[in-house]
Each structure stands twice: as C-alpha cells, then as structure tokens.
C-alpha cells in the first residue's frame, strides 16, 4: 500500500435511532443508523410475517382465476 493516500481509520461511536450506542471502526467521525441489532426484528425475535396466501387469493379474485 502506498503511504499517505489512505484515509485515517479510527474508532467511532455508532448511534442508532433506538438510542443504542456501540463502538466500531470507520474513516468517518460519527455514524448514525436507523436500525441495529438491539431493535432489528431478526435479532429481537419480534418478526412480522406477511401472509402470502392472502395476497395470492386477492390476486386470483381480482382476475377471476380458479
């Protein structure tokens, strides 16, 4: 790697919209995110399942299929 052409990599505080803060590394001074592992449905176990069968039935009814 060439010397002097790469940005300085430093430790930064990442702030989530839910209020959670954690430390990471970046070339930016501060990072703000909308969703993190503390509030994401995959990690919290509060997943919302969309019923695909209901959407298919609605489509079939709309176009007179089946």
UniProtKB/Swiss-Prot annotation:
One of its GO terms (biological process) is translation. Keywords: Metal-binding, Ribonucleoprotein, Ribosomal protein, RNA-binding, rRNA-binding, Zinc. It comes from the Bacteria. Binds 1 zinc ion per subunit. Zn(2+) binds at residues 16, 18, 36, 39. Its cofactor is Zn(2+). GO terms for molecular function: metal ion binding; rRNA binding; structural constituent of ribosome. InterPro entries: Ribosomal_bL28/bL31-like_sf, Ribosomal_bL31, Ribosomal_bL31_A, Ribosomal_bL31_sf. GO terms for cellular component: ribonucleoprotein complex; ribosome. Part of the 50S ribosomal subunit. Belongs to the bacterial ribosomal protein bL31 family. Type A subfamily. Binds the 23S rRNA. This is Large ribosomal subunit protein bL31.
């Amino acid at each position: 790697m060439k010397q002097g052409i790469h940005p300085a990599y430093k430790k930064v505080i990442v702030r989530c919209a839910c209020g959670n803060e954690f430390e990471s590394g970046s070339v930016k001074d501060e990072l703000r995110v909308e969703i993190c592992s503390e509030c994401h449905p995959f990690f919290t176990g509060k997943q919302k399942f969309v019923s695909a069968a209901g959407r298919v039935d609605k489509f079939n009814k709309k176009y007179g299929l089946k």
